[in-house]
Amino acid sequence: MARGGPGRVLVAQVVGSGRGVAARPAFEPGRPMQLLRRSQGDARIGDLVTVRERGRSAEVLGVLGPTTRPAAVMAALLADADVRVKHPSAVTREAEAIPGRLGAGDPGRRDLTGQVAITIDPEGAKDHDDALSIAREGEDLRLWVHIADVARYVPAGGAIDREAARRGNSVYVPGTVAPMLPRRLSTDLCSLRPGEVRDVVTAEMLVRPDGTVDDARFFRAAILSRERLTYPGVDAVLAGAAQAPPGLEEAVTLAAEAARRLHARRMARGALEVTSGEPAFTIGPDRVESAVVEGQTPAHSLVEECMIAANEAVARFMVARKAPTVFRYHEDPAGPPVLRLYEQLEELGVPLPPIADGPLGPQQAREAVSAAAEALGAHIVALGEDGARAASALWGLLLRSLRQAYYTPDHVGHSGLASAAYLHFTSPIRRYPDLLVHRGLLDQLGIGDPGPDASTCAEAAAHSSSTERDAVGIERRADRVALALLLERLLGERAIEIEQDGTVTGVVDAGLFVAFGDVFDGFLPVRRLGGDWYRTHPLDIGLVGEGTGRRVMIGDPIRVRVVRVEALRGRVELEPAALGPSRALTRRRARLGGR
């Protein structure tokens, strides 16, 4: 949305102003602007609207809905970030003109509709990119990873393709999605829905007992998904707490066995394993009903390992063919941040293995981070409940020592996965690089249109890396807003206490970030600590009282009181109700703002 200059467009909230109404910027500081009466239309006080500035007044362009409705708030957030949910009319027309399934008469498309194929997705998912089939062959497991054949429905250069390239990826916010592809494709013709024949590109692999992947083959196929399984449902089956749907128990158990083999092989070659979680929301028509933090479960791991194996197999094939494509690159960590990570974790009492003296090379840095991750995981387990509360904060330190992954046309590698060649093949419904990978793969197999050239791959890699970063920022912001809406409601209904046990998760000069309750986060300004002048620790892992030496460190327990919730901005301000004892093992002084 336009930010500067006369006549700019922005998202605002309708507020009362004397005898009239005004529009106050919803997501940024700014003075209220008197609404032009002729443009007010159906807008009411409390509504979120898009407006165009007209001097000191504003003209309503569209009404998004009241701030009490999560759907309206999410629509406003997307509009504020210039993310379109609806596709241009030319894209919609092109999608609606597709009569139905296109691959029925394709020469060479294999009929695998007799296989047992399953999808495993989050509850509520509608765009099903991938499905799995599996069979035992002696000691080996033959794995088929079926991915939606989006390239069959989206020819290069068409209206759908141009818009998908511009968007780069889908953007997911609580309760809705801004899809890369029009819904006619993303949730219908390309989605691997149960009970419907769908066109796919299949990666067939043999998983050996030691996790080695051999005999990789790629081809176009047609499948019939037997069942739409969910992560919680598969977790219950794997835990023995539930039965798989009839005829699917072997598929689930064999897929889990394949995942265990693949995971063990990845860990043996030095892959990095980091535990983290993201909030998952239940959204009602008029409120955020609930939120839970979803961590990595056996069902998540099952799907992830199979997808990684397929991505690596396609990458190896494209490298061997020296064919242009878009790779996923995760650079080895730099030495200085890793050395600092070791200092931070040791200061916080985490037992770590010895690290080499002097500068670390890329390989040494990667091995050191992997060793730190293993030690940190063991330390968190050893701390029991205290470790569980501090886990996200400690893992956050490790993640901040790593470089960010991005797309590139160059064959390099993926440090975190310890993979010599890696790309994204498994999500062409929601990621444009995956669609380019499909086109290049099918071209090399001689069963598709010409694939992208090197220039197209380079341009798409740069653009998609940028849109991915933007999407991550928007999604995190939307999560904060949804959590603030939930917290505001629970406090208003007195369904949650205003005082909560929390854990320090981050520190800046201005104060502390604190996780509290089961899913909430807030900021505790340093001015509210009281009783002393607090200065940042030299390693940026806590605050230290200048007079008392009192330390409040990352991972420490702290009881907090909610002071203010600014839901639209996703801000929660806290104050200390009581400070728990610091768990850090050493005592050092530091200076606020100085190092």
Which sequence ranges carry the predicted segments?
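Intrinsically disordered, low-complexity regions enriched in proline, serine, glycine
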Residues: 72, 571-574
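Short nucleic-acid-contacting surface segments enriched for D/E, G, S/T with interspersed K/R
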Residues: 37-51, 493-499, 534-560
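Electropositive polyanion-binding surfaces
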Residues: 90-534, 540, 555, 565-572, ...
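Terminal, basic amphipathic appendages of nucleotide-handling enzymes
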Residues: 1-130, 170-172, 226-235, 584-595
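Short amphipathic alpha-helical linker/capping segments at the junctions of internal repeats
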Residues: 578-582
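Short, surface-exposed loop motifs enriched in S/T, G, D/E and P with embedded aromatic residues
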Residues: 12-14, 502, 560
